[in-house]
Amino acid sequence: VSVDCSGYPKPECTAEETPLCGSDNKTYRNKCNFCNAVVESNGTLTLRHFGKC
């Protein structure tokens, strides 16, 4: 399972609720929040699955 995070990080994310579960066992609100975190982690954060953890 993967998400295309090209074009990130973005300065602001919407409040859209489309949860993703990261490899850090944290639920991210949406793709934007998740991709920003992926960039911050230098690519060490990956997608565990779609939906809440």
Curated annotation (Swiss-Prot):
Molecular function in Gene Ontology: serine-type endopeptidase inhibitor activity
Protein name (database record):
Ovomucoid
What's the short name of a Pfam family annotated to this entry?
Kazal_1
Q: Which Gene3D superfamilies does the UniProt entry name for this protein?
A: 3.30.60.30
Question: Where do the TM regions start and end?
Answer: none
Task: Keywords in alphabetical order, please.
Answer: Disulfide bond, Glycoprotein, Protease inhibitor, Repeat, Secreted, Serine protease inhibitor
Glycan attachment sites: N42
Any keyword Secreted?
Answer: yes
The entry's free-text remark on domains says:
Avian ovomucoid consists of three homologous, tandem Kazal family inhibitory domains.
Cysteine pairs bridged by disulfides in the record: C5-C35, C13-C32, C21-C53
